[in-house]
Amino acid sequence: MSSDHEEDSLYGATELFGEPDGFYEKPAESHFAEYERSAVPAQSARRDTQVRIRLVGSSPLWGHLLWNSAIYTARHLDAHPEQVVGRCVLELGAAGALPSLVAGLLGARQVVATDYPDADLVGNIQYNVDHVIYGGKPPTEAPHVAVEGYIWGNDYGPLRRHLPPGQTGFDLVLLSDLVFNHTEHHKLLQTTRDLLAPAGRALVVFSPHRPWLLEKDLQFFETAAEYGLRAELIEQVTWAPMFADDPGPAEVRARVYAYYLTHCA
């Protein structure tokens, strides 16, 4: 028979089978961010000025933050409603999907908001669409703002099925804060080229969160030529950086770059 000391060592005293610290920590809870449409254009189908979006609590894909690039993109859409109203819009890597929501409020004919097919991430986008576009109720007919889980470069069928009959490309493709994925540049450009309508344009917006890799970020626009896409700088603006204490010059991290991509003639 084992002694009391031996029993303690096997069943608790040494915590041989104890869970590691943090094993029972609850995952971070989702949270909300408010966006104000400061200049709603006359052409907008909806006059909503406040857009309240839910963000996942945490995400290895950085979908838990409302990035400067998403805010810039949303403002750009309101400033250029002719690019959206009555047109078909695709957003890649949508995260909280603010630009897609604004496109839906503006009166796009069809919006498809996509991100990596993670259940929490895609479910959160669907929540935002349901609540911002449809008032928290399921749409009674085919939704003009749809949500899809999508991996760049994969089969386009699930995205194209949302397009009107006879149309195979989107009039506007949105890429907000995606070019930091340097290994994915080719897949992003392939997807953009193949899903962009002949006379369409892509709006690419990003901030150099790692200033020492800015050259690699910008390489995206050089590589675009290999895919028959022409890059045009719209502007570079300076906002407050996302994270004040991140490494690298704050002046560089505060930049927001915006480009158009169009098919070469």
Curated annotation (Swiss-Prot):
Sequence positions that bind S-adenosyl-L-methionine: 67, 93-95, 115, 152, 176
Pfam families: Methyltransf_16
Location of region: Disordered: 1-25
One GO CC term on file: cytoplasm
Tagged with keyword Methyltransferase: yes
Principal EC category: transferase
GO biological process per UniProt: methylation; rDNA heterochromatin formation
Keyword Transferase appears in the UniProt entry: yes
Keywords: Cytoplasm, Methyltransferase, S-adenosyl-L-methionine, Transferase
Residue intervals passing through the bilayer: none
A molecular function GO annotation: protein methyltransferase activity
InterPro entries documented for this protein: EFM7, Methyltransf_16, SAM-dependent_MTases_sf
Enzyme Commission designation: 2.1.1.-
Record localization: Cytoplasm
Function of the molecule: S-adenosyl-L-methionine-dependent protein methyltransferase that trimethylates the N-terminal glycine 'Gly-2' of elongation factor 1-alpha, before also catalyzing the mono- and dimethylation of 'Lys-3'.
Family label: Belongs to the class I-like SAM-binding methyltransferase superfamily. EFM7 family.
HAMAP family reported for this sequence: Methyltr_EFM7
Name this protein carries in UniProt: Protein N-terminal and lysine N-methyltransferase EFM7
Protein species of origin: Eremothecium gossypii (strain ATCC 10895 / CBS 109.51 / FGSC 9923 / NRRL Y-1056)
